[in-house]
């Protein structure tokens, strides 16, 4: 069983899904649901359900909701001993508005206390990284945290993989990607980071290669219905993996689930192509459900 440390934020997601096409100047009748989310938390859940030994490093608020977040993660098998409980602002909230096709149209994000989260991660990472096989980190954290984890992983010779919860920090500090083993992003994120346009699969491979030259040697770009591409400059290989069309119920968490499956396979020394294939399967299961991530009931469909 692989041991993977996951570092990132916890959010409580509030999703409103319209029953009909959205109209910004009218009342939209629909459904509203509450669920636990956040890129770091989602990745921790996905990796645990896939059978990895997960150590989650984060903060939650010391209230009923925060306790519920931890209980849910523990039920999936994740270790939450390195999650610190704060009296206030230990986690964020995400308000999402989905259209009747299940696609995200707009959102508002309330962030957890950045300084307290940073302090907790710096404290806990000293102990939590001992004995792990790999580290996954949400890139929507402070530069101080990212630099510290890059330093620790280099010192401990641990592979470090980054996933974009939000692009703002890494967009302003693109040089930090040089400290990562692997980086996975969407087509839109890749276009912003590379200042290049992606229309075809060939475009995506070119952009992934340009990003890999300046950043993580293993770079993946996801392209929704066109699948995903990868470039691995360590082995001078690249490729494309397609995906099957699925009915979208809720696209939230699809990127996190794809990232998790790819990382899970890579830490088991599977090939990049095998990793991306599982990533596509897992993402498809999540997209076709109302879940933010993989749950045990979905595992049979991955066989």
Curated annotation (Swiss-Prot):
Statement: the UniProt record of this protein carries the keyword Transferase: yes
E.C. number(s) listed in UniProt: 2.7.1.73
Swiss-Prot/TrEMBL cofactor(s): Mg(2+)
Keyword annotations: ATP-binding, Kinase, Magnesium, Nucleotide-binding, Purine salvage, Transferase
Cofactor binding note from Swiss-Prot or TrEMBL: Manganese or cobalt, but not calcium, nickel or zinc can replace Mg(2+) but results in reduced reaction rates.
Keyword Cell membrane: no
Name this polypeptide is given: Guanosine-inosine kinase
Regulation: Kinase activity is stimulated by pyrimidine nucleotides, especially CMP and CTP, and inhibited by AMP, ADP and GMP. Activity is stimulated by potassium or ammonium ions.
Induction per the UniProt record: Specifically transcribed in the early exponential growth phase.
Species assigned in the record: Exiguobacterium acetylicum (Brevibacterium acetylicum)
Protein family (similarity comment): Belongs to the carbohydrate kinase PfkB family.
pH-dependence annotation: Optimum pH is around 8.3.
Biochemical pathway: Purine metabolism; IMP biosynthesis via salvage pathway; IMP from inosine: step 1/1; Purine metabolism; GMP biosynthesis via salvage pathway
Pfam families for the chain: PfkB (PF00294)
Alphabetized PROSITE patterns for the sequence: PFKB_KINASES_2 (PS00584)
Gene Ontology molecular functions: ATP binding; kinase activity
Quaternary state and interactors: Homodimer.
Any single GO BP term: IMP salvage
Class of the enzyme per the UniProt entry, highest EC level: transferase
Catalytic activity: guanosine + ATP = GMP + ADP + H(+); inosine + ATP = IMP + ADP + H(+)
Signal peptide: none
Function field: Catalyzes the phosphorylation of guanosine and inosine to GMP and IMP, respectively. Can also use deoxyguanosine. Shows a strong preference for guanosine. dATP, GTP and dGTP can serve as phosphate donors.
């Amino acid at each position: 069983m692989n041991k993977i440390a996951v570092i990132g934020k916890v959010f409580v997601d509030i999703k409103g899904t319209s029953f009909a096409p959205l109209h910004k100047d009218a009342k939209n009748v629909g459904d509203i649901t509450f669920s636990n989310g956040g890129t770091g938390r989602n990745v921790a859940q996905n990796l645990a359900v896939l059978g990895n030994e997960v150590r989650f490093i984060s903060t939650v608020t010391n209230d009923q909701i925060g306790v519920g977040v931890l209980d849910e993660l523990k039920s999936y098998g994740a270790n939450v001993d390195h999650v610190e409980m704060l009296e206030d602002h230990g986690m964020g909230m995400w308000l999402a508005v989905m259209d009747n096709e299940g696609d995200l149209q707009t959102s508002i994000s309330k962030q957890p206390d950045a300084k307290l989260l940073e302090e907790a991660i710096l404290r806990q990472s000293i102990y939590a990284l001992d004995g792990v096989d790999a580290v996954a980190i949400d890139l929507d954290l402070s530069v101080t945290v990212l630099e510290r984890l890059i330093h620790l992983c280099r010192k401990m010779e641990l592979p470090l993989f980054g996933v974009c919860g939000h692009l703002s920090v890494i967009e302003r500090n693109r040089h930090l990607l040089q400290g990562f083993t692997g980086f996975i992003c969407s087509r839109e994120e890749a276009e912003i980071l590379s200042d290049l346009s992606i229309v075809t699969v060939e475009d995506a491979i070119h952009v992934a290669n340009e990003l890999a030259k300046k950043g993580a040697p293993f770079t993946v770009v996801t392209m929704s219905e066109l699948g995903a591409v990868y470039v691995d400059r360590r082995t001078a290989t690249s490729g494309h993996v397609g995906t099957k069309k699925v009915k979208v119920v809720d696209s939230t968490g699809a990127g996190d689930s794809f990232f998790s499956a790819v990382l899970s396979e890579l830490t088991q020394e599977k090939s990049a192509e095998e990793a991306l294939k599982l990533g596509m399967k897992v993402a498809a299961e999540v997209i076709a459900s109302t879940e933010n991530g993989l749950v045990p009931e979905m595992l049979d469909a991955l066989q």
